[in-house]
Amino acid sequence: MTITAPPKDEIISKFPGSEPLLNFYNELSDAEKSKLFHQISTLNLSEAHQWFIDSADQRAPSTAEDLKPVLDSQHFVQAELHQVILDGLWNKGMDAIGRGEVCAIVLAGGQATRLGSSQPKGTIPLGINASFGDSLLGIQAAKIALLQALAGEREHQNPGKIHWAVMTSPGTEEATREHVKKLAAHHGFDFDEQITIFSQDEIAAYDEQGNFLLGTKGSVVAAPNGNGGLYSAISAHLPRLRAKGIKYFHVYCVDNILCKVADPHFIGFAISNEADVATKCVPKQKGELVGSVCLDRGLPRVVEYSELGAELAEQKTPDGKYLFGAGSIANHFFTMDFMDRVCSPSSRLPYHRAHKKISYVNEQGTIVKPEKPNGIKLEQFIFDVFELSKRFFIWEVARNEEFSPLKNAQSVGTDCLSTCQRDLSNVNKLWLERVQAKVTATEKPIYLKTIVSYNGENLQELRHREISDSALESDHSINKFFVV
């Protein structure tokens, strides 16, 4: 039902600061007026003005003396742990899954604009699986289904379910919901009981002076409020999730094709250390611009490369590792109690400024497409809550096995579809080598079915078998394991 928009003067009176957004109000159709009025009434313009002011008043810049690596007692490297310890962590994580205590939250609000698509990034075809679930969300749904099956097979283990919470944005919610519904039906998930879909807020964009911008004569320029928008967006759902028995959250970005959703090792590690917050990281590479997980004035924080500076960023330890080498990959563990605390209205995160090129309608009604940054979008960062942690830990994993994001168009050549396909194939080959299968296939990538193996298990039947192009095409005892 369309809401009838009130007169222009009434809107200005009710929503201070909205007057410049109504310059062309009298030229709009009734439907366009209603749409603009709805947008103005939901963007919280009065608070947005204050957010812009506050975003310029951030903490004092950190100095080299302020920044220290996270203590060794809080930083564990998975590859350095004995298999017996890893098995124990896996079992502890699987126990939590079996009891239905784990919720996986995927941050899926982004569109695949850089990839040349208007679809949500989590739904675009990957060119890997021709049958079903050929998307990032499809791979992740299959991993959840497999973990649930593995939990159900364990002796004395309840067949627990992993709750899947999907954070979208206003521009991606409808398409993402339909995609996830199909995945849920395919894997036997109860969509209403096991899946929560919720949308992060949008915030108006600004020019450099803090004025709001029109994208068209009848719409305000607005954008999702960053991955830190998770906390305000999910807060209303926490009581229901707690009532379901959820105690632990695994939060991850949709674009990482190698993400181990609800990773039992990671969850078991965090539970064993009584962590309220834990984060996965990978060793940083030379010149890499990802943030570093470190201590800033004694509190855990992710510090951007630009803030570290080249000298600190390149500093090494006696054993040749980067001193600030814990590269953040936006992959986190939180307890329910911690989420309750940081999602309360009194724990609002700060906004950070991002200078962007923003197309807008000028006072003459002409659309302006700038060639350089001309405006500001505000974002909240998911990791800004780290400093509120009472027991913070890092879980360092192998980049080649757990981190390959899909961010760029194919023409860029890095973090693009072909590198994701390559890295997924390489992980699958690594698993096959560990069971001493002989991989001789060379014509195409090797993709194990996601539902077959989560972490290289269930592949003993392929021990000493030759994985060749012909075997993948015609030998059912082999090709039943693979996407062919």
From Swiss-Prot:
Keywords: Cytoplasm, Nucleotidyltransferase, Transferase. It is found in: Cytoplasm. UTP binds at residues 107-110, 121, 200, 226, 255, 377. Its EC number is 2.7.7.23. Pfam families: UDPGP. Its main location: cytoplasm. It comes from the Eukaryota. The keyword Transport does not apply. A motif (Substrate binding) lies at residues 107-110, 304-305. The keyword Repressor does not apply. The lineage of its organism: Eukaryota, Metazoa, Ecdysozoa, Nematoda, Chromadorea. GO terms for molecular function: uridylyltransferase activity. One of its GO terms (cellular component) is cytoplasm. This is Probable UDP-N-acetylglucosamine pyrophosphorylase. Pathway: Nucleotide-sugar biosynthesis; UDP-N-acetyl-alpha-D-glucosamine biosynthesis; UDP-N-acetyl-alpha-D-glucosamine from N-acetyl-alpha-D-glucosamine 1-phosphate: step 1/1. Substrate binds at residues 227, 407. Belongs to the UDPGP type 1 family. It catalyses: N-acetyl-alpha-D-glucosamine 1-phosphate + UTP + H(+) = UDP-N-acetyl-alpha-D-glucosamine + diphosphate.
